[in-house]
Amino acid sequence: MKNHIYIHIPFCESKCPYCAFGSFSDKFGLIARYFDALYKEINRANLGEISSVFIGGGTPSVVKADFYEPIFEILRPNLDKNAEITIEINPGTINKSKLEKYKEAGINRISIGLQSSKINLLKEIGRIHTYEDFEDTVKLAKEVGFTNINVDIMIGIPNQTIYDVEDTLDKILALDLTHISVYSLIYEDGTLMTKMIDDGNLDEVDEEIERYMYWYAKRRLEDNGFIHYEISNFAKPSYRCKHNLGCWSQKEYLGFGVAAASYIDNFRMKNTDSLEKYINNINNDKFYKNLTIEEKQTIDDQMKEFVILRLRMMEGFRASDFTAKFNKDVYKVFENQIGKLLEEDLIFAEEFGYLRLTKKGLDLANIVWGEFI
């Protein structure tokens, strides 16, 4: 069985006010110790054949590029010859030398966090870069030889207008990228931005306007040759993200690093959120103390998750795929839920057996998921 690997790099120059991921802007003194612990954790794992590697954060590009080569010395013997290897980078934390070292290590895909082309909106969400920094990063990446480049953009930012989204799309479409992710700003519990909303110091974008931004972005991207293959993701032909496809298809994945999650043999596990505990436990050969089993999925859990994750995909899923995996009829297992969603025009059934979200279902996806939780 082929595995997918996630590696978490938790360091950031500053914590964005909307970010709920495990990241630290005040612990740079622990970088070397963290990577030493990370090497040990990866080295003791049963890696199997690796289909994809995703290095996320945090801001992986904020640390020296030399820290990554030892990781790939460990992974390289297990990498599939067509493995997709992604690293997230942020403009303002990257230079040509880092990109060259990434390429030499074997990284073949980069994901750049732009979010918006408008400086006022970047400041609103705590980003430390400008659009010009992003454009320079893309140019450098192409000079070094990267051909698989994703950019993340965000909609629903406070004070954002449809004209801001138009400007962002105009600019990034001119750069000939291969993958674009369009995310709605989500106000996660415990973040500074959520507190500002709760305290009345910040206004959310009207939901109807945010949805208009989404459909505008979808149309523009599809008109420019991008395939809309998942709710938030658009790719040029042959450039769909293998790592994410694996996760959405319930493939197993191994997570390394602080706060990293794993999915193995129907168990969902997660490493400690404490950077110091993570390092100390590994240095004391107490790897098990870092790991918490969050869920042992039953067959019912697996079937529900199958439907939720597959409906995230624009192609949906065939009833026969469900039967092949679980030896059950999805229409019988979820008779009430599917009947209700069909009646409410949130999903539709195609003549070839596919179940998919409707346009209305795309806008109300959380209601669809709620039927299976």
Residue ranges of each PLM-predicted region?
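Short amphipathic alpha-helical interaction segments
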Residues: K328-L342
